[in-house]
Structures are given as structure tokens and as C-alpha cells.
């Protein structure tokens, strides 16, 4: 027997064909959400408050300080928040201290700071009763970046940018004359030496001393001449910069100093964030630039004064490693700026002189920023000078330019950081308000409560959750789509890219995506490559860079250890990483002398002893959905992409089955998705039924798990959980208590395992269509339950309150038979389109009645005249069984919108069997539409009499190159015959030897094909056919949701043409090309009525309707409304536009509202006309009958 048994949870054993020993379990798959939010509560929120506060008033006599905060218990439970359309949020109380600096008085007070949405254990937020997800954002990291560009003459120029988290950008660039310029915040450029002089290094000699002698520096100094001898060079530079930043304002050196300080050196205006400081220190550190260069002078330790490295030494990796411990103390130089500088502190730089790589006769000066501490959140003069040095060194062939798509330069902003940014925005708005209140009010009686207005903060948070591009309605089709949505990474959103500006490079797969972002799972269409998914082992470090785990290789012994090292993309660039599929012996050493490995994007063979790390698992490359595709390695990447995306659209079935051929990922995906119920602690089941399970812990306390039955999911499917445990079962923490939707025995089960044959049948599976046996309909194999929610609310109107009632005017008793005494539908009633769900009447304005009418009205109380029917009815195309009714009223203490007195929600469940027009798919991107459902007796059958369930077109395989489906087919049949389940993990699954040996073990023929007999004739087909078991899923694109027909419906206001689309109950567009077709046929009458009555001839269509109901000839059509619109449009351009008839007489086009009243039938009149026509018709029919009897 090939393969080995593996246990998944307590309910499933699979035969696995994997060969690689997994040394690291998958992390919790939603930790990117939960960890980030927890981090925000523990540190992020506090940090934001400390950034903005303390705040002083304008006279600096009062100061408001932040002390701490506390989150109290949420107001609603999860279930209550869902039911009441409320937020699942907790009140937050912040303690402030108000200090009076004159009297020394301190007032401390706890202030209510609004309700803060809380993340559920599943990684979601409940906002207005609906589950939402905050998608993590992929953005360019703050830091310093260098680039090169080739101009039209083929000359290479260089550029550099310092990008902060917030604040002004500082750019450097060269021009065609080899002069270096700088730009501050995208303004006009100035020679870079001008900025150096403004920083207090004004002499040419000083500049040469700092940067060394190079052509770029010389050319720039020549350009930057001293124009005004009355000013010092620094003052002149400051004025020049001020003129660029604030053109037209009077320039003084003092105002320029304060402007530059505010722009770059004030922590409130400029923030690099810890990640920006880390990236700048890493880039401007000298180690990388000095590697393999030759020293031109001795290197001295600043503290001891000893010579550490002599001139002429080549700085190899080994040499640098020897001096690593003292490297930061070597060659430190302090420069003192002059008295007119922006900042007066001394500037500490690390300065080496090396032999120029391009010309051994010259010496190049290399400057580092001497590693400022991590808490220095602004840019420093040392950073600016070191950036300029790196920029000048690039022209000398030192250093290297950055690749912006490298994942070392892109980071993730997860939920916590996105929320912190929102709170910061709110607090900054609040701070302006605070200053004014502190200055205006009396200091003696001031308390924190009086001066703090929390509105800006709560508004910022509300806006973020309600309308940000990154706050999304959770995709809840099935557990996999939930999980994928939580792990999604979007490059769009505020501060990110836009679809139109993103080019091919940003969207493309980059070598650093390996193990960090899935190269396969991304949408097709305009967002391709901009929306990605985290790889299965991906994990964020404290700076937001994605790390991936590797096994460390002991270079001394050549042993692959089980020690796990997590590396970011730029750390990985320094190493050679071997593949996880490289064979190892029993001592964990490589079997082969040469192994396949990766280094900086090159996939090549390396000597085994040169590898530093090894992948932990073959599936670390791909995301969760992709890792659920068996034989992924045999599929073309485009089809694998479709397969991964379509699994997320699977509809939960009534009785789903886990795949015979899985990948072993199904258990983990179901466990972490949040859709199942997982035991929180060890214990024993003391009560279990369909609604709740109680587990007694060892310490005696009781855990109660509530099980959801047929709840409506965000996608309108049934969210139904099934209890898995029995009374008396012992459960351990992490065990399944209940399966969620699309799960079976603790594994994800998106579809079913039908018997599939690759064969044509009467042409019905042309173009990927699917032929299906009636068994799948009768036995409810692909039946799903869908829940739709309808609501009706009563409001107060000017004419009186609306009312929910059974007494509805002009409605027969038959239509009310399923309503209760209040006028609300009974639970369990079957309803069809047009049926009343909630009877509701609205008062309507009375025409002035005569005295007699008023008297009669008062005596008999004729209600029908004063109210109109506004009942909630089942919309077009919907039907089903009423599953639940919820009633919310103010009397019960429910929170309703203002003006609403009562809200009724009706849930209708619909059981949908599979039918012609529904979309089906396999896991390999093989999708198709059901074209015919054939009676079981007519389907082809196997020699043992088993009829086939599905027939697919064999022509769908070769051109699409997704051969994985054929391998799955054969292995699936073997698994069915053997009565086992199989796991074939991606890139480490069943080989063809395993496949054929399992086929042989199952007693199948050696070619895995079989003879099929035609169900209609009993004759065998000419050729042997591939028949097997393939996992097939029913997708969310169902024909019931798409089919649509319109008779009478709404029109667009301006053009008076029917609206478009099913949601608007619109018509089918008869476009330009369709008009050409009718013209080609010469069908002039058909054409005329399509362009007039059936479109936008307003009076014509009403008269036509009237003529049809009265049985009169249809009158001539009038002028289409769109023609009037065109006339008006031309008139609005100032053109004198008239319409002439054939005798050149002007035709007057009356506007609709000017037309004669006879021409226009109002809607009310139309209803009356319909009723009258119906009555007339009934009378005529009765008369005919009477005549017949006579």
C-alpha cells in the first residue's frame, strides 16, 4: 500500500501521500486580524494618546495630560448586536489630568470616550448588525529609496526620496549637466548644496570635507554661487529655500529656519514611525556599502584611538564580521554647524574613505548616519547628509538602487494600525478644539469633562467602519471565503494605489512573494495583482513586514535542524534557501551533493554545503484556498487561479461531503475559519442537543456553546451548525463541538463526490456545459437553502401614523389567509411572489368632502377612503417558506431610528435544487453551466450497473492544461472503491507511481478507464471512457437569481426610458446594433414600436395601453422623449433648434407638463382605468355567457 494514515481531528483518517516530514504546524490562520487588534488595545491606543497629548493652552498656563484608559463590558452580546442592528462595541473610559501651572492644582477625571467596536473571536466586527472585516493594506514602507533613470540621450541619472509616515518628502535628483538638486515636498528644485549650507555647513571647503571631491559636488557648487555678499551663505541659502516653499511671501532667514524646523524636525508635523527609522538606519548603515571595497586610509576606534583596520584592507564579509562588535564606534566624526543654521546641535557622522571602484587612483568618501536611536521619529541632519552621500556614491558605482516592488520595501498595515491612524485623526481634530476651550474658559472651574469634546474621535471611527474602502462587508458564502477575506491584502485604499495608476510591475509576481504572498490567489479583472492573499505560513513582524519560516541548516555539519527562523524579504536576500522537497537522509543531511535553491530571485543549483536555510513545507508558497487544490502541480497557473477563486463561491449544501481526494488542508481551514464551534477548554459533555452543548470543565465550571440553526449569512445562504459531540464525550481544547456550514466531520466540505465521465453526449456538453443525472436533483445532492430578509417599518406621517393591520383596503380574504390578527404573516406559511407579508396602511390626504359626505363618513366610519395599501409583499421572482418573523417596537425598549414606531422583519427560506442554468465547477478551474438534466435510466452506466452522475466534455482538458482534474478523477474512483479518504498535499502529493499502485489496489483496469453502456439502448459505447469520482461544487451564480422578465415597470426620470437591471425591475436594452439588425430586415413597424411605445414615447405608450385594454386600434406614436432631451440639450448650448415638418412649417414640441390633460394619464388614473377595463371585460364575459345560455 502506497501512502500512510494521518488522523485529522477526531472524526477523519486520510491516507496521505506526502513524503516530507512537517516540522512546523500551520499558525492560527486568522492571527493577522486577532493579534493586530489585541496589539492595538494593549499598546497602539495608548501610544496615539501619548503622541497627541499633553496639550497646553495658548498662554501655557493649563495643561491636559493623558493618564490611562479602560474598556468596560460590551453593551450587547454578539447575538443581541446582530438582532438589534447594533454595533458590538464596548464603552471606553479615558482618565485625564488637568494641571494648572500657575497654582499647581491638579484635577484628575475619568471621561466617557464613546463606544469602541470590538473584534469578535472570529476576527470580524459587527457594525449595524452585519459582520464586517477590516482588510489589511499593503503600502510602501516609510524610509529612504534610491532609483536610477536613463534619459533620452542614454545617460544614467540617479534619484533619491525620503518618505516619512506623515510629513514632507525630501527628494534628490541629477540632471543632464551632472548637477545634483533637491526638492522639498514636491516644490521647485534647488542645488543640494543650498540645503547643506542651510543646515550650517556653508563653506565650499566644508562641503568638500564632508562629501569628498567628486564631479557632481564640483558642478553643483559652481551652480550654487554667492549672490548677495551682505548675507552669510547660510542665511542666503535659507532665504532661497523659503522662496521655493512659500513663493511671493517676504523672505527672511528667521522665517525660513522656523519653516524648515516645522517641516522636518518637529515630531508633531513629521513622523517616520519606528519602521521608517529602522529602514533608514538599515539603508544608510555603512556595512552594505563597504562590503568588498578597499580602504584608502586607516580605520580608528573613536573611543580607544587604536587603528582597527589598516589602509589597503579589502573589507570582505569575514573582515567586517570580525569588527562587527565595535563597528558603530569606528571613524566617528562630529561636525559643528555655524550659528545661523536651522539646528545648532553637533552632527555625528561615520566616515570612511575607500578606493573608487571605477578608478583606483581616486578616493571616495562614504558617510553613514551613525545609527540614531529607534525613538528618534523625525529625520535628522545626519540622515540628510548620509542620504546625500549615498546618492553621490551611486554615481561612483557604490551602493545599489531599490526595487519598489520588493517586499522588503512594502509593508502591511493591519487592523490595529489602521484603527490607530483613525483615532489619531480624531484626536488631532479634538486637540484644536481643546486649545480654544482651555483658553476661553475660567481656569478655576475647568474640569477635563468640560473641555473635552469626543465627537471628532467617535465620528472618525464611525466613518472608518462605515465607509472606508478597507472596511468590507464580510464575504460569507462559505467558511473558506470567510477565511480568505480575513487574510486578504489590498494595495488599494487611502494612502495606497488606485486601479488606474497601477502598472504591470506592481501587479506582477515578485520573487519576494515566495512564502509571503500567494502567487496564485488574486481576482481576475481590474484588481488583478492589487488584491492578494497571505501565504499559508505568512506572519507579520513588529514593523509590519511579512515573514516566512525556514529551517536553519548547520553549515559546520551540513545538518538540516528543526530550529525555525522567521525571515523578512530583505533578510532572506543574504542567504541561499534550499527547497523543502530536497531529499534528506536519516541524519537530516542532504542526500545529493547539488540541491535546487533560491538566492535573490535566482532559482538554480547550488552545492549542498552552501545552503543556509531550507523551506519548512511545500505549501508555504501558496494561500489556504490554493492549498486545497489536489494535484495543483499538474495544473496551469491561470486555471489554478480560477479554481482557488471559485472554491470561495461555493454554496453551502444541505448535506455536504468532504472530498475523497483532499490535500489535508480541509481540517485546518474549517477549524480556523470561525464558522465551526471549537472547544475552549478540556472537559466532558454533560448536555448536547441541536441548539446547545454544555461541557463540564475539570475545575467544575460549565461552558455553554450555543449552536446557530438556519441563520441568514451575509450572502443570503443558510448559516447552519450541526452538533458533532454526544453526551458523555470527552473533549479537549481545540476539538470540534459542532460543524459549521459546508463542513462534514470537522473538515471543509464545499461540494459532493459524484461519479463523473469524460464523454460527449448528443452535443449537450458543448462549450463546457455539464450534463447531469436526475438523481442529483431527486436525492437533494446539490440542494441548498437560501434565506432572504424583508423588512417593513411604520412611521409617523404628516397625516397621521402608519399602521400594521389585517384591514387592508381592496384586498380579498384569500390574500389575508396566512396573516395573523395583527396582519403579520405566520411562521411556516408558504408564500409566492405578490403575497402579503406584512399588512400596512398609510393615511392619504383627503379631498375636501361635502357636508353630506362628511356626515356619512362620521356615521359609517368608511376607512377605505382615507388610507392606502402600503403592505410589504414578496418581490418578483421570490418564494419560499416563512422561517422567522422579528418584531421591534419602542414599547419593548428596542432602539429604532427616529420617526420609526415599529419594525417587522420577515425571513423567507427557499430550498433550491440544482437546475438547468446553474453553474458548477471542479477545483481545477473547470467550470460550466448545467445544460441538461437527464433521467437516471437514460444516463450511461458502468458494467456493474451504476449510472454516471455527471458527463463533462473531454475537450475542456487539453487546451486548458489543467491535468490535475484527470488525476483526481482516477484517484477519486480508487478511493471510492477502497472506501477510504485520501490526502495529496500540494507539491508533495501522490506521484504517478502512487496513483497507479492505488488504482491497481482498488481492482480497477490498468488504464483506469472502463466500458460504458448507453442507458437508452443498452449498447456499449465504441471507446473506453475515463470515469471516476471528482469533487464538484455548486457556485453562487444560480439561474434563479439571474432570470428576469418585465411587463410594466419604472422609467428613468429624464429620458423616460425603462430602467436597466434585475434589481430595478428594468427592461432589456435594445441597443444601436439591434436597431441595425431590424433595419437590415426592413421590419419598419416593429422598429417603430420598439423606438416609441416600448421605449420613451410617454403619451403614446399610455394611449396604446388604453387602446389595448379597450380593444380599440392603436393610435399613431408620438415623439420619443429622448428626442426632446436632445433638443433641450442643443438649446442649452445656445443653438436655435426648431423642428419642421415636410412643408417647412414649425412643429411645436410641448413639454410634458404643458400638454393637454387628455394626453396624460396619471398613475392613479391608470390604476382606475385598469380596474374599469377589468370590470368592463368581466361584464362583457358575463353577458356573453348569458347569451349562450339563452
UniProtKB/Swiss-Prot annotation:
GO terms for molecular function: DNA binding; DNA-directed RNA polymerase activity; ribonucleoside binding. Disulfide bonds: none annotated. Keywords: DNA-directed RNA polymerase, Nucleotidyltransferase, Transcription, Transferase. Its EC number is 2.7.7.6. It comes from the Bacteria. It catalyses: RNA(n) + a ribonucleoside 5'-triphosphate = RNA(n+1) + diphosphate. It is an enzyme of class 2 (transferase). GO terms for biological process: DNA-templated transcription. GO terms for cellular component: DNA-directed RNA polymerase complex. DNA-dependent RNA polymerase catalyzes the transcription of DNA into RNA using the four ribonucleoside triphosphates as substrates. The RNAP catalytic core consists of 2 alpha, 1 beta, 1 beta' and 1 omega subunit. When a sigma factor is associated with the core the holoenzyme is formed, which can initiate transcription. Belongs to the RNA polymerase beta chain family. PANTHER family: DNA-DIRECTED RNA POLYMERASE I SUBUNIT 2. This is DNA-directed RNA polymerase subunit beta. It comes from Streptococcus suis (strain 05ZYH33). The gene is rpoB.
